[in-house]
A protein has these predicted regions:
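His/Asp/Glu-rich metal-coordinating catalytic cores
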Residues: 1-63, 68-215
Length: 219
């Protein structure tokens, strides 16, 4: 198996990674980045997908982990270069569809909604969607199965036992897959060097509402 990062490493944003095994390529996420201060006149930064265009016959589709711009924002631009089906969860698909409408791509783009716990087959790959928790709902981690072994792609995540909506992250499923053996783990590492634990989104929400109420009262 070849793992080909096309963006998102050692930077914030523009997350996109290709997984290749023989005649099959699947692409996880397709995000954009925002320009640095010295990038004058540039509004958005999108990934270089030359490799995907050069191997278009192998590419089976985009698999999207969640609906933040740094994971989906480049889709309308990339789809104009190489039209591929999109696989993701319901809420994430809804966000993507709004973008596709803006770019007149909705009718020409194949889409499939996938539930957590469900798997899809794309060429030589089988991809399982695993429930994750993040600051946006319906986030997924992925178990990417191939004849070479299984790769776990966490997507963006936090271990949140009290999310605002829905179930907590499915740590049991990670453990079950881990017992069988994993070829590689690709993990979100944002703030990994900071001490302590990430707050639950429920706590973040209460803190934000309390602060807003206090500011309004002071005014």
């Amino acid at each position: 198996m070849r793992i080909i990062p096309l963006g998102g490493l050692e930077q914030i944003g523009m997350n996109i990674t290709a997984f290749e095994y023989e005649d099959s390529i699947v692409v996880v996420d397709c995000g954009l980045a925002f320009p640095e201060d010295d990038m004058l006149g540039i509004d958005l930064v999108i990934p270089d997908v030359t490799y995907l265009k050069d191997n278009a016959s192998k590419v089976k589709g985009f698999v999207i982990t969640h609906g933040h711009e740094d994971h989906i924002g480049a889709l309308p631009y990339v789809l104009k270069e190489i039209n591929l089906p999109i696989y993701t969860t319901k809420l994430t698909m809804g966000i993507i569809e709004n973008k596709l409408k803006e770019h007149n791509l909705l009718r020409t783009t194949k889409r499939k909604v996938v539930r957590h716990g469900q798997s899809i087959n794309l060429g030589k790959f089988r991809i399982e969607f695993i429930k994750a928790t993040h600051s946006i709902q319906d986030a997924s981690a992925l178990a990417i199965y191939s004849p070479a072994g299984v790769v776990i792609h966490t997507g963006d995540f936090k271990v949140d036992y009290t999310p605002v909506f829905g179930d907590a992250i499915d740590l049991q499923r990670f453990a079950e897959i881990g017992k069988k053996g994993v070829l590689a783990l690709m993990s979100d590492s944002t703030n990994a060097e900071r001490r302590g634990f990430t707050q639950s989104e429920k706590t973040v929400g209460i803190t934000s509402v309390s602060y807003t109420h206090l500011r309004a009262h002071e005014t």
